[in-house]
């Protein structure tokens, strides 16, 4: 998955089941025809013309963990567990605001990928349970 650089409220999500764009502004999900390159880690679709959208996930890549506003997420691992014969550690993700205040936003088995949109107004996380989106609401 990856956020559009030109349209930062649009998130491309590619799975074995389907390819979609999630609109972080209105919550709509649109099925798309997209092509992606697992080596270059980019996706293209006619829904986001003239753009190679960077993607990250099971094949590599990384979404940004910092915002232009000075916020960030910090990822750490704790408590080993054996699940289906594999040793896994719980992953904890902490959101740190620009003043240094910390809030735990995720504790679970490791996510596949997470990160902010280019404008820092959306945060997405994908794990075995699905895709989770947090959106900044300015009052």
Write out the residue ranges for each language-model feature.
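WD40-repeat beta-propeller superdomains and closely related acidic/aromatic-rich repeat-like regions
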Residues: 1-139
């Amino acid at each position: 998955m990856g956020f559009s650089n030109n349209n930062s409220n649009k998130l491309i999500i590619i799975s074995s089941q389907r390819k979609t764009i999630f609109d972080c502004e209105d919550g709509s999900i649109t099925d798309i025809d997209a092509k992606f390159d697992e080596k270059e880690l980019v996706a293209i679709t006619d829904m986001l013309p003239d753009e190679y959208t960077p993607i990250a996930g099971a094949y590599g890549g990384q979404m940004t963990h910092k915002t232009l506003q000075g916020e960030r997420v910090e990822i750490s691992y704790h408590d080993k567990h054996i699940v289906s014969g594999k040793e896994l550690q719980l992953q904890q993700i902490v959101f740190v605001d620009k003043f240094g205040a910390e809030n735990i936003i995720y504790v679970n088995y490791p996510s596949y990928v997470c990160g902010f949109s280019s404008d820092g107004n959306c945060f997405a996380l994908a794990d075995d349970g699905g895709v989770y989106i947090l959106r900044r609401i300015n009052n």
